[in-house]
C-alpha cells in the first residue's frame, strides 16, 4: 500500500469525513424544516431550494466515490441517445446487486447535472434514517411499504405530485424490490418456475406493479425509460466502506434509452414487457461476464468539480470550530471531559457504521426471504 493509500485508510480521515457529513447534514435538515413555510406560498420555489439543499448532502457521497476513491464509471450506450441524458425526465430501471449501485447512479446523475433532482422509489424504513432519509422527505422521494394493498393509492398519489415538477429529474426504481443475494435468488426463481416464467441467472424476478404504476402516472411527463445494467470489472464486490477507505473501483454500465411510447399502457402487457426487459438484462450480464464489456459505444461523462467544491466549503466552515472545540476539551485536563469526548466519538462512529450497514448486502433487507414474506403475487 502506498503512502496515499495508507492515509486514506486512517480512522482520523474517516472521522473528518463523517463529522463534516453529519454536521452539514443536520444543518441542511434544519434549513429544510424552515423552508416548509414556503410550500403554501410558492411550491415550485420550495422544490428548487430543496433540490439545492439535497445536493449539498448527496454530493458529499459522490465526492467520496469520484474524488476520494477515484472510482470511474464507463457508460455503454447508443451515441444517438446520449444527447438526451440530463436534458429530459426519465425513469431509470437499475439492477440491484451491489452495495454501491445507488452511489454509481448518483455519480451518473451528478455528471449529467441533475443530482439534486434525482428521485427514487424507496422502502419506507429509509425515511427514518437520519440526514439522508430526512432529506429525502423534503425532496418528495416516494416511499413504499412494499405491501401492494397499502401502496397502490399512496404511491400513485405521490407520483402524480411529480407531474408538475419544475426541473428535469431521474426517477430510479429497483424493480427487483430488494438487493440480490443467492438465497433470495433461489426463492425468486422458484416463484418464476411456478408462474411459467424463464429463469434469470443474474437478477431476481422483477416486481411489476410498482413499475406499471410509475409508468402510468408519469407517462405524459416522462419521455423515456433508461434501462441501466451495472457491473464491475474483475469481479469486484465494491462496498461503501471500501470507498471510504479510498479503494478504487471501475464500474461499467449499459444504458438503453427506451421511448415511453414503446411501453404498453395496459398493466398486464406492461408487466410482460418488464419481464422481457429483465430477460434481456440477464443476457447482457451473461455477455459481460464472458467478454468483460457491454454492447454499444463506451462513453465516460466528464467529472464535474462541484461535488468537491461543495465538500471543501462545508469542511472550511465546520472543521475550524471543531478543532478549536477539541483543543479546548483536551487542554481542560478534566478526566470527565476527556471521557465524554471519547464517548461522543464512539457514538458518532457507531452511528456512521450503522448508516453504512444499511447498504451492506449481508445486513440488508429480509424482503424476498421465504421466512419473512408470503409468496410474490405480482
Curated annotation (Swiss-Prot):
GO biological process: CDP-diacylglycerol biosynthetic process; phospholipid metabolic process
Pathway: Phospholipid metabolism; CDP-diacylglycerol biosynthesis; CDP-diacylglycerol from sn-glycerol 3-phosphate: step 2/3
GO cellular component terms listed in the entry, alphabetical order: endomembrane system; endoplasmic reticulum; endoplasmic reticulum membrane; mitochondrial outer membrane
EC number(s) recorded for this UniProt protein: 2.3.1.51
Residue window of motif HXXXXD motif: 96-101
Main location class: endoplasmic reticulum
Keywords of this entry: Acyltransferase, Endoplasmic reticulum, Lipid biosynthesis, Lipid metabolism, Membrane, Phospholipid biosynthesis, Phospholipid metabolism, Transferase, Transmembrane, Transmembrane helix
Its membrane topology: Multi-pass membrane protein
Membrane-spanning parts: 11-31, 125-145, 311-331, 338-358
InterPro entries: Acyltransf_C, Plipid/glycerol_acylTrfase
Subcellular locations according to the entry: Endoplasmic reticulum membrane
GO molecular function: 1-acylglycerol-3-phosphate O-acyltransferase activity; lysophosphatidic acid acyltransferase activity
Reactions the enzyme catalyzes: a 1-acyl-sn-glycero-3-phosphate + an acyl-CoA = a 1,2-diacyl-sn-glycero-3-phosphate + CoA; (4Z,7Z,10Z,13Z,16Z,19Z)-docosahexaenoyl-CoA + 1-hexadecanoyl-sn-glycero-3-phosphate = 1-hexadecanoyl-2-(4Z,7Z,10Z,13Z,16Z,19Z-docosahexaenoyl)-sn-glycero-3-phosphate + CoA; 1-octadecanoyl-sn-glycero-3-phosphate + (9Z,12Z)-octadecadienoyl-CoA = 1-octadecanoyl-2-(9Z,12Z-octadecadienoyl)-sn-glycero-3-phosphate + CoA; 1-octadecanoyl-sn-glycero-3-phosphate + (4Z,7Z,10Z,13Z,16Z,19Z)-docosahexaenoyl-CoA = 1-octadecanoyl-2-(4Z,7Z,10Z,13Z,16Z,19Z-docosahexaenoyl)-sn-glycero-3-phosphate + CoA
Swiss-Prot/TrEMBL domain comment: The HXXXXD motif is essential for acyltransferase activity and may constitute the binding site for the phosphate moiety of the glycerol-3-phosphate.
Protein family: Belongs to the 1-acyl-sn-glycerol-3-phosphate acyltransferase family.
Function comment: Converts 1-acyl-sn-glycerol-3-phosphate (lysophosphatidic acid or LPA) into 1,2-diacyl-sn-glycerol-3-phosphate (phosphatidic acid or PA) by incorporating an acyl moiety at the sn-2 position of the glycerol backbone. Exhibits high acyl-CoA specificity for polyunsaturated fatty acyl-CoA, especially docosahexaenoyl-CoA (22:6-CoA, DHA-CoA).
Name of the molecule in the record: 1-acyl-sn-glycerol-3-phosphate acyltransferase delta
Species of provenance: Rattus norvegicus
Amino acid at each position: 500500500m502506498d503512502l496515499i493509500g495508507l492515509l486514506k485508510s486512517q480512522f482520523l480521515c474517516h472521522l473528518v469525513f463523517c463529522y463534516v457529513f453529519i454536521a452539514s447534514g443536520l444543518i441542511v435538515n434544519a434549513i429544510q424544516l424552515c423552508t416548509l413555510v414556503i410550500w403554501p406560498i410558492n411550491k415550485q420555489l420550495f422544490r428548487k431550494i430543496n433540490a439545492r439543499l439535497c445536493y449539498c448532502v448527496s454530493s458529499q457521497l459522490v465526492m467520496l466515490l469520484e474524488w476520494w476513491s477515484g472510482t470511474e464509471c464507463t457508460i455503454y450506450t447508443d451515441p444517438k441517445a446520449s444527447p438526451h441524458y440530463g436534458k429530459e425526465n426519465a425513469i431509470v430501471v437499475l439492477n440491484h446487486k451491489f452495495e454501491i449501485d445507488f452511489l454509481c447512479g448518483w455519480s451518473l446523475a451528478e455528471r449529467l447535472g441533475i443530482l439534486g433532482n434525482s428521485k427514487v422509489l424507496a422502502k419506507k424504513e429509509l425515511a427514518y434514517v437520519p440526514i439522508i432519509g430526512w432529506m429525502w422527505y423534503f425532496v418528495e422521494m416516494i416511499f413504499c411499504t412494499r405491501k401492494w394493498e397499502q401502496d397502490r393509492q399512496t404511491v400513485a398519489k405521490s407520483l402524480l405530485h411529480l407531474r408538475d415538477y419544475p426541473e428535469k429529474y431521474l426517477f430510479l426504481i429497483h424493480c427487483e424490490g430488494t438487493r440480490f443475494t443467492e438465497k433470495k435468488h433461489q426463492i425468486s426463481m422458484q416463484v418464476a418456475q411456478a408462474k411459467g416464467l424463464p429463469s434469470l441467472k443474474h437478477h431476481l424476478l422483477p416486481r411489476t406493479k410498482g413499475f406499471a404504476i410509475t409508468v402510468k402516472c408519469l407517462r405524459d411527463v416522462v419521455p423515456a425509460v433508461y434501462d441501466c445494467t451495472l457491473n464491475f470489472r474483475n469481479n469486484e464486490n465494491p462496498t461503501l466502506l471500501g470507498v471510504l477507505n479510498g479503494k478504487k473501483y471501475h464500474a461499467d454500465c449499459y444504458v438503453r434509452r427506451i421511448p415511453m411510447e414503446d411501453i404498453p399502457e395496459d398493466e398486464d402487457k406492461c408487466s410482460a414487457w418488464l419481464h422481457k426487459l429483465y430477460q434481456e438484462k440477464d443476457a447482457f450480464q451473461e455477455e459481460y461476464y464472458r467478454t468483460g464489456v457491454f454492447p454499444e459505444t463506451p462513453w465516460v461523462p466528464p467529472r464535474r468539480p462541484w461535488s468537491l467544491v461543495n465538500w471543501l466549503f462545508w469542511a472550511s466552515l465546520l472543521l475550524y470550530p471543531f478543532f478549536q472545540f477539541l483543543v479546548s476539551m483536551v487542554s481542560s485536563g478534566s478526566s470527565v471531559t476527556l471521557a465524554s469526548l471519547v464517548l461522543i466519538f464512539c457514538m458518532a462512529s457507531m452511528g456512521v457504521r450503522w448508516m453504512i450497514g444499511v447498504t451492506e448486502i449481508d445486513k440488508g433487507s429480509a424482503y424476498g426471504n421465504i421466512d419473512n414474506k408470503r409468496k410474490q403475487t405480482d
